[in-house]
Design a protein with these regions (language model features):
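Amphipathic alpha-helical packing segments from all-alpha helical-bundle domains
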Residues: 92-101, 105-134, 297-305, 315-340
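Short, structured motif recognition centered on aromatic/hydrophobic residues
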Residues: 8, 55, 97-107, 117, ...
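Short, amphipathic alpha-helix enriched in basic
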Residues: 1-21, 25-28, 49, 200-202, ...
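Helix-turn-helix
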Residues: 10-46, 230-264, 268
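Short, basic, alpha-helical segments at the C-terminal edge of helix-turn-helix-like DNA-binding modules
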Residues: 49-55, 271-277, 283
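Hydrophobic alpha-helical connector segments
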Residues: 46, 57-95, 146, 279-305
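Long compositionally biased, domain-poor regions of proteins
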Residues: 106, 225-233, 247, 254-258, ...
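Hydrophobic/aromatic-rich alpha-helical bundle segments in the mid-to-C-terminal region
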Residues: 114, 118, 133-196, 212, ...
Length: 384
C-alpha cells in the first residue's frame, strides 16, 4: 500500500495520491483504505519517512564508496559530482528524486510539507559536509556549493540526463565549478555557446522571446501572469482554464480565447515566469513580513521547478527545460556583469545561476538563505 502511494506521489504528485487511485492500485475501496490508514497526511508522512531512510542508505553507500579518498582535489570533485548526478536519476533513486522534487516545490507554501522535508534536507546537506570535511580547504563552502548545484542540476537530469549534448554542457559546468571558474579544459568559449545553439535547433525550441506575445498590458498578459501564479502555487497539474480564470478575474472563455489548449496555457505560464523574472509582472501576493526581492526570486525559481517537474512526467515538455536553463544563465551573467564582474563569460553565468537557483530551492524548505555568500565566494576572483 505504501509502495503504491510512493509511486503515485512520484509519478503524479501529491494531488494524484488519492484514496480512489490508491484503491485502484491495490484492489481496495476508498472507504476501507481511509478506515485502516487514516488521513492522507498520515500516508504522506509514512511515505516520506521511508523515503528518507532509503535516501540515507543511498548516501551512506556513497560515503563508504569514497572512504579511501584522502583529498578532494579539482579532478576528484568533478568526478564525484558527475557520477553522483548520473546515479541520482537511475532506478529507484529516480523515484526518490521525483518525490523530493515534488515536495520541495510545495514546501514554501505548505507548512506541513516543509516540516516533513526539512529534516530530509538536513540529512542531504550533512552528506556533503561529511564528504568534504578534512579533505578540502573551505570545506563548509564547498559543501554548500555542492548541495546547491546538485539540487538544480539533479532536477534537470530527470528530464534530459541521457542527452549527449546536455551531458557535455553539464560536464562543462561541473569543470567550471570545480575549478572555481578557471578557464581551461573542455569548458571554453566558443564551444559552450555553439553547443547551446546546437541544442536549440535540434530540440525545436520556441524561436524568439517566449514571453513576447504576453508583454503588452491587457487581459492576455494578466492571464499569463495568473497562469504562472497557478503553476507556482499548485504545479502543472493545477493549471486549468478554470483555475487561471479565477486567479485572473476573467471568464473561462476569455482565457480560452487567448490560450486555447492545455499546451498554450502551459506556455503562457512559462511566459509569466519570464515576465516576473524581468520585473515586468508581479509575483503572487507577498506574505506578511517577506522580503519583496527574495519573494520574487523564489517565485521565479518555483515556476522553473514546476516546469522541470512537469517535463519529468511528460517528456514532450523537455525543450522548455533546456530553454529556461539557457535563458536563466544568460540573464544571470548580465546581472553579475552589471555588479562589477565584467569578465564573466556565458559558462560562468550558467554555473553561478545554478548555484543561486539550487540554493533558492533549498532555502524555500529550511529558510537557510546562503545564496549570495555562496555565489560571491565562487565569483570573487573575477571582480573588476
Amino acid at each position: 500500500m505504501i509502495e503504491a502511494a510512493r509511486r503515485e506521489l512520484a509519478q503524479g504528485g501529491l494531488r494524484a495520491m488519492s484514496f480512489r487511485r490508491l484503491g485502484d492500485a491495490v484492489g481496495a475501496t476508498s472507504g476501507a483504505l481511509a478506515y485502516h490508514l487514516g488521513a492522507k497526511a498520515a500516508i504522506l508522512n509514512e511515505v516520506v519517512t521511508r523515503e528518507r531512510l532509503r535516501d540515507r542508505r543511498w548516501h551512506d553507500e556513497w560515503l563508504e564508496r569514497l572512504d579511501g579518498l584522502e583529498r578532494v582535489d579539482r579532478q576528484a570533485l568533478a568526478a564525484i559530482l558527475e557520477q553522483y548526478l548520473d546515479a541520482l536519476v537511475q532506478g529507484e533513486a529516480r523515484l526518490t528524486q521525483l518525490i523530493w522534487m515534488d515536495l520541495t516545490l510545495r514546501a514554501p507554501r505548505d507548512a506541513e510539507v516543509a516540516t516533513l522535508v526539512a529534516p530530509w534536507l538536513a540529512e542531504r546537506r550533512g552528506f556533503w559536509s561529511r564528504l568534504f570535511e578534512g579533505r578540502i580547504e573551505d570545506a563548509a563552502i564547498w559543501a554548500g556549493l555542492a548541495a546547491a548545484y546538485v539540487t538544480d542540476e539533479g532536477f534537470n537530469g530527470l528530464v534530459v540526463g541521457d542527452d549527449p549534448d546536455y551531458r557535455l554542457l553539464r560536464r562543462m559546468a561541473i569543470d567550471r565549478l570545480a575549478s572555481r571558474l578557471e578557464r581551461d579544459g573542455v569548458g571554453l568559449e566558443p564551444l559552450f555557446s555553439r553547443l547551446v545553439r546546437r541544442m536549440d535547433r535540434r530540440l525545436g525550441l520556441p524561436t524568439g522571446d517566449v514571453a513576447a506575445d504576453a508583454m503588452g498590458p491587457g487581459p492576455r498578459r494578466e492571464a499569463a501572469l495568473a497562469a504562472c501564479h497557478v503553476l507556482v502555487d499548485g504545479g502543472a497539474e493545477a493549471l486549468t482554464h478554470r483555475a487561471v480564470a479565477e486567479r485572473a478575474g476573467l471568464s473561462r472563455s476569455a482565457v480560452g480565447y487567448y490560450f486555447r489548449t492545455a499546451a498554450d496555457l502551459f506556455k503562457a505560464a512559462i511566459s509569466g515566469v519570464y515576465l516576473i523574472a524581468d520585473g515586468r509582472g508581479a509575483p503572487p501576493t507577498l506574505p506578511p513580513g517577506a522580503d519583496p526581492t527574495l519573494w520574487r526570486g523564489q517565485t521565479v525559481v518555483r515556476g522553473e521547478l514546476a516546469v522541470i517537474l512537469a517535463a519529468a512526467r511528460d517528456p514532450t515538455l523537455a525543450p522548455y527545460v533546456i530553454d529556461q536553463r539557457r535563458w536563466r544563465g544568460v540573464s544571470y551573467v548580465r546581472l553579475l556583469r552589471s555588479k562589477g564582474y565584467s569578465g564573466l563569460d556565458a559558462l560562468d553565468g550558467q554555473t553561478a545561476s545554478m548555484i543561486a537557483t539550487g540554493q533558492t530551492i533549498l532555502s524555500g524548505v529550511d529558510g537557510d538563505d546562503r545564496r549570495d555568500p555562496l555565489v560571491s565566494w565562487l565569483i570573487a576572483r573575477h571582480k573588476d
